[in-house]
């Protein structure tokens, strides 16, 4: 059944590529993957393979990639992605020697791919459970590790009807899981080699903070040295349901400056954002100059790659996605010692639950709950600062997963 589903997905991508640009990139990338390997793989080199579904999973694996690169330079790094949103952004990443798409997990694709490259070990990040690739790696006695994985009782592996697919988990040499519940669930289905290490994203956001870049135009907008400086609210990875809530508030409150870094930066969505903003001076980052940004009320980030550094300039952050499929990366904001707000779809995100528990994160349900929180932060600077410190402390307290993983891997 699994292989039938994989062939159906492959067929769907092939057909969809005729009409959809994202699927077209994925299809072409998958078709070229083995050719790229045949051209670039050095026969005598030892490759460590990292696979990430998309950009978020790559960021979880990145601390491991760079630590191995630094401490074990004799290895070369192969990095694969499933999604264009990961590959297209990181295809020129200097931390890997070869970067490709991973072809759909059919038997034929897996065999061709692993004939073209024979890694000495593999790391699959978080939710990557590709049976045919994993089965071949296991058959060849190649160690394969699941990193930053997290499991819940409602996942298919732990249901009576998912026992067949659950066999894929037995292909892993070891699991590096985020919490005790994940380890216990694996133990219940006969998998004992699981180590609790936490989430490598905590290490990653601390690295980002350490290496953050100055953004002169954002500094000009924030104007921190001004005697009458306004507080700055940063909305990261926002979607329209998020924007409708916080923009309604800021249309009524002029004591804040607002930076919006929407998840989608297409012109249609940017026009929608502009239509929601009333009576404020708005500047798009790509059009910003020193002379027009200082007295602006709203700065819209209409390009990628800046958000993690932009959070540095905020006093309160909002992370989008909580009114849709799920919140985006709250740790990128929390590491900067400020309160982090997000929508209600956060129950499956351990880091959001941790921030809520420790007092650095706040759940927003609607305009009224958002307004109450923002008014409190505006009126009580000591409270806002204390909540921000709790957010930063939470991130620092859970760092160290990268070293824990590497101490349990034979390199």
What are these regions (language model features)?
Residues 1-26, 274:
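Helix-enriched interaction subdomains in cytosolic or periplasmic regions
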Residues 14-211, 215-217, 224, 234, ...:
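Active-site and donor-binding regions of nucleotide-sugar-utilizing enzymes
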Residues 113-115, 168, 292, 310, ...:
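Structural alpha-helical scaffold elements that stabilize or flank donor/cofactor-binding regions
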Residues 142-144, 258, 282, 340:
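Hydrophobic beta-strand scaffold residues
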Residues 172, 188-189, 307-393:
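Catalytic binding pocket for nucleotide-activated donors in carbohydrate/polymer assembly enzymes
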Residues 201, 283-324, 329-330:
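Donor nucleotide-activated moiety binding/catalytic core segment of transferases
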Residues 202-206, 233-287, 295, 301:
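Inter-lobe coupling/hinge segments of SF2-like helicase ATPases
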Residues 398-411:
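C-terminal alpha-helical cap of glycosyltransferases
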């Amino acid at each position: 059944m699994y292989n039938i589903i994989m062939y159906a997905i492959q067929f769907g991508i092939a057909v969809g590529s005729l009409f959809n640009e994202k699927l077209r990139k994925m299809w072409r990338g998958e078709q070229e993957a083995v050719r790229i390997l045949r051209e670039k793989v050095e026969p005598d080199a030892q490759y460590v393979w990292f696979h990430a579904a998309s950009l978020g999973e790559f960021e979880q694996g990145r601390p491991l990639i760079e630590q191995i690169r630094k401490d074990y330079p004799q290895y070369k790094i192969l990095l694969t992605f499933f999604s264009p949103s990961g590959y297209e952004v990181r295809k020129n990443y200097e931390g890997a020697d070869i970067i490709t798409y991973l072809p759909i997990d059919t038997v034929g694709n897996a065999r061709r791919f692993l004939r073209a490259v024979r890694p000495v070990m593999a790391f699959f990040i978080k939710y990557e459970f590709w049976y045919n690739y994993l089965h071949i790696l296991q058959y060849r006695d190649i160690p394969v590790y699941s990193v930053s994985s997290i499991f819940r009782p409602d996942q298919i592996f732990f249901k009576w009807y998912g026992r067949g697919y659950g066999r894929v988990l037995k292909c892993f040499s070891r699991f590096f899981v985020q919490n005790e519940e994940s380890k216990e669930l694996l133990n219940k289905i006969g998998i004992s080699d699981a180590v609790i290490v936490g989430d490598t994203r905590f290490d990653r956001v601390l690295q980002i903070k350490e290496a953050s870049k100055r953004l002169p135009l954002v500094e000009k907008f924030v104007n921190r040295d001004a005697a009458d400086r306004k507080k700055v609210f940063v909305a990261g990875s926002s979607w329209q349901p998020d924007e409708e809530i916080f923009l309604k508030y800021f249309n009524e409150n002029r004591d804040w400056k607002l930076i919006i870094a929407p998840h989608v930066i297409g012109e249609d969505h940017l026009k929608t954002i502009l239509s929601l903003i009333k009576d404020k001076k708005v500047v798009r980052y790509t059009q910003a100059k020193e002379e027009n940004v200082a007295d602006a009320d709203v700065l819209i980030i209409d390009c990628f790659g800046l958000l993690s550094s932009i959070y540095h300039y905020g006093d309160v952050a909002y992370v989008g996605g909580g009114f849709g499929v799920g919140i985006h990366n709250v740790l990128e904001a929390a590491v900067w010692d400020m309160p982090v707000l997000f929508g209600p779809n956060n129950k499956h995100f351990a880091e959001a639950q941790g921030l809520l528990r420790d007092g650095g994160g706040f759940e927003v349900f609607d305009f009224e709950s958002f307004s109450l929180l923002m008014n409190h932060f505006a009126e009580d600077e000591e409270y806002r600062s204390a909540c921000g410190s709790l957010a930063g402390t939470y991130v620092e307290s859970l760092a160290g997963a990268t070293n824990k993983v590497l101490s349990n891997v034979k390199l």
